[in-house]
């Protein structure tokens, strides 16, 4: 990446984070003085934050792991190959709630896709996330897997609300990236996320994804336009 590309990426990242912070803090009726305090707190944290070497080591470990096959097994979760006969109903339930429906967001058609359309597409690879006791909690996917160009779009979802924000999404995503890079031979994994979803953006950056651009007013849901942030992981 040259200096110009790095400058553009940094500008996009700063703009994205700023918009996300404004959207979140507006819910708490922040005043000018509150934003000044927030800016000072960010500056203080930037000076004292831990080294990024541990995160870089984590990324290297993900990309250098051995080839995996189903079921993919981690410390707290497993990912098994999606089974239409046993998994369809529970996944379809997840995809009908406010968070789950983003998994079905289509950038290729005038409407959202359906679970049936996703699993009928031979270029889509789906995996069911479970706890170690086989309790289903979420879904991973590689969409439009391109063997010739070694790339695919990644999507993830923790469908059960009580299992969100507990680290399961990160562990499952690491397993899925390992499977994609070391078994499927992917050289690029990309994803799209709502630009003000700071939690998701942070998780993706921790796993090596970099901001590639902002798609302005890319989707229209509940009578509101949303900007999408595109992020990519390149395997050298």
What are these regions (language model features)?
Residues 26, 30, 163-164:
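Residues in soluble alpha-helical coiled-coils and helical-bundle/repeat scaffolds
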Residues 28-59:
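Short, charge-rich amphipathic interface segments used for partner binding and complex assembly
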Residues 2-27:
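N-terminal acidic leader/helix
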Residues 77-105:
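Short amphipathic alpha-helix that is part of the acyltransferase structural core
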Residues 61-78, 82, 88, 126, ...:
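Acyl-donor (CoA/ACP) binding surface of acyl/acetyltransferases
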């Amino acid at each position: 990446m040259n200096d110009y590309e790095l400058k553009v990426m940094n500008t996009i990242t700063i703009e994205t984070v700023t918009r996300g912070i404004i959207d979140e803090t507006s819910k708490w009726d922040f005043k000018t003085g509150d934003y000044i305090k927030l800016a000072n707190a960010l500056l203080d944290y930037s000076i004292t934050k831990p080294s990024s070497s541990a995160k870089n080591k984590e990324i290297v470990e993900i990309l250098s792991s051995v080839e995996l096959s189903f079921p993919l097994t981690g410390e707290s979760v497993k990912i098994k190959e999606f089974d239409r006969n046993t998994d369809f109903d529970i996944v379809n339930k997840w995809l009908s709630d406010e968070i789950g429906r983003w998994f079905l967001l289509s950038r290729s058609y005038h409407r959202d896709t359906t679970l049936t359309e996703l699993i009928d597409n031979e270029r889509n690879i789906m995996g069911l996330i479970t706890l170690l006791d086989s309790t289903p909690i979420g879904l991973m996917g590689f969409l439009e897997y391109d063997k010739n160009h070694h790339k695919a779009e990644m999507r993830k979802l923790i469908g059960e609300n009580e299992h969100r924000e507990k680290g399961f999404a990160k562990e499952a995503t690491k397993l899925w990236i390992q499977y994609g890079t070391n078994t499927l031979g992917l050289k690029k994994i990309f994803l799209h996320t709502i630009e003000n979803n700071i939690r998701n953006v942070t998780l993706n950056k921790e796993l090596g994804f970099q901001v590639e651009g902002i798609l302005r007013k890319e989707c229209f849901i509940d009578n509101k336009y949303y900007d999408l942030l595109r992020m990519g992981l390149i395997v050298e």
